[in-house]
Design a protein with these regions (language model features):
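ATP/NTP-dependent adenylation/nucleotidyl-transfer catalytic domains that generate, transfer
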Residues: 1-46, 56, 60-64, 68-74, ...
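Conserved G/P- and acidic residue-centered "switch" motifs that form tight phosphate/ATP-binding loops
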Residues: 51
Length: 283
């Protein structure tokens, strides 16, 4: 008989709680260390979608580097909502950071016209990768480092476009679950209009993250925390979770493992990059 996990719901939620003030200090120190100390770069550039993840990263960058050293890029497509643009502007106004708006419609549609019957998923991936192309090009123009904005829940669930959202070399919120992103955002003063709206990639009308994933962020975070702690599905269900949701989350984690790694290299020597050739900073 399987043992019942000694982790009632309130203990699981307690494990997800963060010390927001301490987390802010650590993440701003992390950004200063990664940019200024390790790379000798003083400026950051990030895509600002109007969502909570990029909003929080903008706040962290402004605190770490000073608002004068943070450059946001809004990259709307023709189907992007005006609300998203307005919310991005709220962040710019609140922080006093620089911001450019670069339309990606012509670039995306120019490719899609030559593509073979692009479905909504392919279209969304093209949009995400085009935004990353713009971000890296603008980083070269500005002499600024691109900063990632993906959270841990999305990364574990594989809910991101490979070689797009995961591409920037530094990500201050990649180890924060979505519920922790909400908590830190409230602590740092991100506008409530951004915090309280339903999370959406804004790739098509009426699309929401939770609708795409098939589970709420709160439920996903609770289940993910137990999966990462090593509990089996039956043990997690014994706490009170729906077994179908547990299986959905685990399936997403296991089927997208490849997205969280660099491309697999065939080893033909004892000095393969990222396998044997590692510097101390890589450990």
């Amino acid at each position: 008989m399987l043992p019942v996990v000694d982790a009632p719901l309130h203990r699981i939620d307690a494990a997800l709680k963060i010390d927001a003030a301490l987390t802010e200090r650590w993440l701003t120190a992390f950004l200063r260390d990664e940019l200024i100390e390790r790379r000798r770069i003083t400026k950051a550039v990030l895509g600002l979608s109007g969502g909570i993840d990029s909003a929080l990263v903008a706040f962290l960058c402004a605190r770490a580097l000073g608002p004068e050293n943070v450059h946001a890029i809004r990259m709307p497509y023709r189907t992007s909502s005006q609300d998203s643009l307005d919310d991005a502007q709220r962040i710019v106004d609140a922080l006093g950071i620089k911001c450019d708006t670069i339309e990606i419609t012509d670039a995306v549609d120019g490719y899609l016209r030559a593509a073979h019957e692009p479905d909504p998923r392919r279209r969304g991936n093209v949009m995400a990768r085009m935004r990353m192309l713009v971000l890296f090009d603008q980083s070269a123009r500005l002499g600024a480092l691109p900063i990632g904005t993906g959270n841990k829940t999305e990364r574990m669930m594989g809910y991101f476009t490979w070689h797009a959202d995961d591409t920037p070399p530094v990500n201050p919120i990649g180890d924060l679950f979505k519920t922790q992103v909400w908590a830190l955002s409230r602590h740092m003063g991100v506008p409530l209009e951004v915090i309280d709206k339903p999370p959406s990639a804004d790739l098509e009308a009426n699309q929401t993250d939770e609708g795409d994933m098939g589970v709420t962020y709160l439920t996903a975070d609770r289940i993910l925390s137990q999966i990462l702690a090593g509990y089996r599905d039956e043990q997690i269900a014994a706490v009170g979770f729906d077994l179908r949701e547990i299986e959905l989350v685990r399936r997403r984690v296991e089927s997208t493992h490849w997205k969280r790694h660099l491309p697999t290299t065939a080893l033909v020597s004892g000095t393969a990059i990222n396998e044997f050739y590692l510097r101390p900073v890589d450990y």
